[in-house]
Structure formats: structure tokens, C-alpha cells
Regions:
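N-terminal Rossmann-like dinucleotide-binding module
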Residues: 1-40
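A residue-level signal for conserved active-site and pocket-lining positions in enzyme catalytic cores
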Residues: 7, 29, 53, 83, ...
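Short beta->alpha connector loops
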Residues: 8-11, 64-67, 88-90, 252
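Donor/substrate-binding cores of folate-linked one-carbon enzymes
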Residues: 22-25, 82-201, 208
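N-terminal glycine-/serine-/threonine-rich beta1-alpha1-beta2 phosphate-ribose binding loop
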Residues: 36-79
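Acyl-group handling in specialized metabolite and lipid biosynthesis
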Residues: 203-216
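An anion-binding loop in the catalytic cleft
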Residues: 215-311
Length: 311
């Protein structure tokens, strides 16, 4: 099938690769504009999807706006039968959604209608979900509200981070996408409307989510740490006299009567901190200001922490 692909980050690369490998004619790729990088912001970094497209000699288009008619004109010239969107990062206007004869479909990294929005993987982990998945849906005017074509679920590991789940779902989504496209091409795709009563949202993440509140349970904080990777990263200024970023934690399963925020142990295994409801969280990887990410044990060699210090 003649397909126009729209995507930007690493998550979308397996989907593009899968379409090419399946023998579809990818007539073009839309990706967000290159971003300036470097100390002086004087170098342009192409998106992962752009790099993938160029490696396959696929024409790349990077419109700044989607509503000024330029993007639509480019699409009409390319004349795709279907548009496939995977983490493009732009909202498509109705005239683009209705342009290809077989419509537009999207690879969404949640089990819709749960977690509509920009950060579904992160919120699934932050909220302590044990199952996630991907959805292939027909795109509609309302964000992430279109009919479901296919879904596949996967368990979230107890210590799996959002960053790790992101990589797994990108592969799962690519495989499911190829199946869905084949069904659409054969006229066999089933469309299931979303249940509006089950909708939950996954808004963009912000730095305001980073601070750790030690009155919460160890499990809730463990989910926060895992869910805020790779950005904005959980942090605390209550333990060491400086704000540290927390990258890896463990639920010890221990119990304590100490006040939340109390450092119970600091050594080779990490930093054990009292949390809400008498639970204990162990910090095993962190980053101090101006330093690289490191094991908590390595940090402690140069920054000893007094055990039983209070919040």
C-alpha cells in the first residue's frame, strides 16, 4: 500500500522500519523540524525518524505548520492511500485527516481509552499500573478518540522504568501496526468505538512532578522514580543537604516506625529512607548537582550521610 508516515522520536523508528520491511510503498515521511544542539545551539540535529527515512531514501518533509495549506498540498502531491502516525508531535487538521482515501491511523502507546494524551507510558508507570500496551486507531478530530482497530497488552515489570517500557512498546507497536495495515489493505479491519466512560488522560510531564514527598508510600515513590525517566527525573533535597536526582530505587519490604524522610541506612546497598505507612525505599542510583549519574554507594564515599537524620 502507498503510505505516508509521520513520526519524530526513537519510538516511531521501529514502525517505519516495519512498514518498509513489509514491502509497503512509503512515499514520504513527515517529521518535526531539526533542533539546534550544542553549546552554542549552532548545529542542527535531525530527528531519529528523519535519519531512518534518509537511510531508506524516502523523501522527508518537515513543515513548521500543519494548517497553512503547505502540508496539505505536499500530501495531495504524494497521494498516499493511508497516513500512518506514530509520535509525530503535531495535531493534524481535519483536511489532512480526510485527505487519504483510507484515512489516518495512529500508533498510541496505551490501551485506549486509558491514557489519552502526550505521556501515556510515563503515567502508566507513575500510577502503578501492572499492564500497558499499544493501540492502533483511526484518527479523529478529538485527540486520541478515534475507533480502535487493534490492541495488544504487555505486563509492566515491577522495576521497569518508563524509558525501558518505551523501548518495548515501540517494538510491540510496530508489529501490531503491520498487522493492522494488512487488515486495512484487505478490507478486513474492524473498528471499535472507544468507551467514553473509561477515558483517562496522560498530560505532558513537567518539572513540578519531580520532588519526592516522603510521606507517600515506598511503592508510590518507586513508581514515581520509574515513571519520570528519562525526564524530568524524580528528585529530593531532604536527605543530603543538596538536591539530588533519583534514578533507581528498590522497595525493601522492610517496616519502620521512623518519621518519613528519615535516613535509616547508608552504605554499599544504597540509601534506605523511611516513607509513609512505615514503608522503606532504597535509593540505588542518583545524580548530584554538577556530577554524573552514579551508584548511591559511590556517592556516599565522598558524601557520607548521617543515619537517622530528619526531614
Amino acid at each position: 500500500m502507498r503510505i505516508l508516515f509521520m513520526g519524530t522520536p526513537e519510538f516511531a523508528v521501529p514502525s517505519l522500519e516495519a512498514l518498509v520491511a513489509a514491502g509497503h510503498e512509503v512515499c514520504g515521511v513527515f517529521s518535526q523540524p531539526d533542533k539546534p544542539v550544542g553549546r552554542h545551539q549552532n548545529k542542527l540535529q535531525p530527528t531519529p525518524v528523519k535519519e531512518c527515512a534518509l537511510a531508506h531514501n524516502i523523501p522527508v518533509f518537515q513543515p513548521v505548520k500543519m494548517r497553512d495549506g503547505t502540508a496539505l498540498a505536499q500530501i495531495q502531491t504524494l497521494a498516499p492511500e493511508l497516513i500512518v502516525v506514530a509520535a509525530y508531535g503535531r495535531i493534524l487538521p481535519d483536511d489532512i485527516l480526510t485527505c487519504p482515501p483510507k484515512g489516518c491511523i495512529n500508533v498510541h502507546s496505551s490501551l485506549l481509552p486509558k491514557y489519552r494524551g502526550a505521556a501515556p507510558i510515563n503515567w502508566a508507570v507513575i500510577n502503578g499500573d501492572t499492564v500497558s500496551g499499544v493501540t492502533i486507531m483511526h484518527m479523529a478530530t478529538e485527540l486520541d478518540a478515534g475507533d480502535i482497530i487493534a490492541q495488544e497488552s504487555t505486563e509492566i515489570g515491577a522495576n521497569e522504568t518508563a524509558e525501558e517500557l518505551y523501548r518495548r512498546l515501540s517494538i510491540l507497536g510496530a508489529d501490531l501496526l503491520v498487522q493492522a495495515v494488512s487488515a486495512i489493505e484487505a478490507g478486513l479491519a474492524q473498528r471499535t468505538p472507544q468507551n467514553s466512560e473509561e477515558v483517562t488522560l496522560a498530560p505532558m510531564l513537567g518539572k513540578e512532578l519531580s520532588p519526592m514527598d516522603w510521606s507517600r508510600t515506598a511503592h508510590a515513590l518507586h513508581c514515581q522514580v520509574r515513571g519520570l525517566l528519562p525526564w524530568p527525573v524524580a528528585s529530593t533535597d531532604k536527605l543530603t543537604g543538596e538536591t539530588i536526582k533519583v534514578y533507581r530505587t528498590e522497595e525493601t519490604g522492610g517496616k519502620t516506625h521512623a518519621q518519613p524522610g528519615t535516613v535509616l541506612a547508608a552504605g554499599k546497598q544504597g540509601i534506605d529512607v523511611a516513607c509513609g505507612e512505615g514503608t522503606v525505599l532504597r535509593i540505588t542510583e542518583l545524580q548530584a548537582p554538577g556530577k554524573k549519574r552514579m551508584k548511591a554507594a559511590d556517592y556516599l564515599r565522598g558524601h557520607p550521610i548521617a543515619v537517622q537524620s530528619q526531614e
